[in-house]
């Protein structure tokens, strides 16, 4: 968190209008099996990697407040219903769905209930796979 002000200040100076974050809650998006998967490039399992890269709710809220204080919009990609609920509680103006989740219809339908704009990434998916 210590580098956040410097990065956000630089973003503002560069003309950034919207900061897009990723909201991960490892316990809500990964099974216990993820604790057994260890990529070859690390000693940590996938669960630990995601958990270590995730901001706590308090830290993410502070990030959002700092972004807004600087006059930029804060949006995020939630990877679970719990993450979507967190963002909804903060009344963010829009949600981003990552290309890996563009077929996660239960999550997308859940987020649609918030009546906010959704930016849907499709990545390398083809039209058939996203219909």
Language-model region placement:
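Active-site glycine- and acidic-residue-rich loops that bind
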Residues: 1-4, 119-130
């Amino acid at each position: 968190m210590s580098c956040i002000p410097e990065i956000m200040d630089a973003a503002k100076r560069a003309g950034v209008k919207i900061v897009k974050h990723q909201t991960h809650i490892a316990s809500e998006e990964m099974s216990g099996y993820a604790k057994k998967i260890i990529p070859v490039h690390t000693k940590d399992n996938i669960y630990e990697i995601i958990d270590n890269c995730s901001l706590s709710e308090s830290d993410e809220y502070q990030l959002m407040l700092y972004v807004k204080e600087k006059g930029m919009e804060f949006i995020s990609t939630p990877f679970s219903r719990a993450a979507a609920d967190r963002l909804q509680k903060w009344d963010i103006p829009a949600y981003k769905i990552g290309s890996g989740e563009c077929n996660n219809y239960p999550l997308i339908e859940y987020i649609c209930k918030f009546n906010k704009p959704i930016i849907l990434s499709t990545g390398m998916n083809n039209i058939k796979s996203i219909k």
